[in-house]
């Protein structure tokens, strides 16, 4: 399935769904989730087009390999990559670290004779993010301030991050389990646990 095949339309004025055998109402597909970020509670929404065939899914602080398409609420495209690209989820907007762990990685992959890679049964979805889980009051490229965002994406692979190379995956250094690695400092030395290889001063 390609991103161009995932299309969101406004219902006609009569409220009737065109071609119901081919289309679905968003209300029947959307999952509502809540999270707290910077002391504010947010609702965000996801659609699971395909869960993904692997038994593994990323953690909020992992490296991920994805393709994606980001649009504003008026369907203006502001960012995309049709080929797989790698991200550290700690360096993306907060919404990605909440949403991608809800999906599984691709079941497997094949390296083709031309050197390209085909991923089979990846996680495929759509996320609807409030501005507070996006760029909020900061304009980013063509994204205006306080913009709600929509991303279509495919999740191919993920890998544990260990930012301080202490053999403890970074997601396990989130002691208070709030999806924020920067506010966990076990030994009070002003270095967050995930970048402090001796966070217990032993």
Predicted regions and their residues:
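Short, glycine/small-residue-enriched coil/turn segments at secondary-structure junctions
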Residues: 36-40, 45-65
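A short beta-strand signature
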Residues: 62-74
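A beta-strand/beta-hairpin structural motif
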Residues: 48-51, 72-151, 165
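Acidic/polar, low-complexity intrinsically disordered N-terminal segments immediately downstream
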Residues: 1-47
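Short consensus segments that form the blades of beta-propeller domains
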Residues: 55-61, 140-145, 182-185
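Short beta-strand segments enriched for Tyr within beta-sheet-rich domains
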Residues: 64-66, 125, 149, 201
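Extracellular calcium-associated, cysteine-rich motifs in secreted modular proteins
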Residues: 158-202
């Amino acid at each position: 399935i390609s991103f161009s095949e995932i299309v969101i339309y406004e219902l006609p004025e009569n409220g009737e769904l065109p071609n119901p055998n081919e289309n679905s109402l968003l209300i029947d597909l959307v999952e509502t989730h809540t999270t707290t970020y910077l002391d504010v509670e947010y609702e965000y929404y996801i659609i699971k087009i395909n869960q993904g065939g692997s038994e593994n899914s990323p953690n909020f602080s992992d490296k991920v390999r994805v393709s994606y398409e980001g649009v504003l609420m008026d369907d203006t495209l502001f960012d995309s990559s049709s080929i797989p690209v790698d991200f550290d989820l700690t360096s993306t907007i907060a919404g990605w670290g909440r949403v991608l762990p809800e999906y599984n990685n691709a079941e497997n992959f094949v390296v083709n004779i031309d050197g390209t890679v085909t991923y089979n049964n990846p996680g495929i979805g759509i996320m609807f993010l409030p501005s507070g889980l996006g760029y909020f009051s900061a304009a980013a490229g063509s994204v205006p301030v306080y913009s709600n965002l929509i991303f279509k994406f495919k999740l191919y692979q993920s890998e544990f991050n260990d930012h301080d190379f202490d053999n403890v995956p970074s997601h396990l250094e989130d002691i208070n389990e709030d999806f924020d690695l920067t506010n966990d400092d076990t030994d009070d030395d002003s270095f967050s646990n995930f970048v402090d290889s001796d966070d217990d001063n032993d």
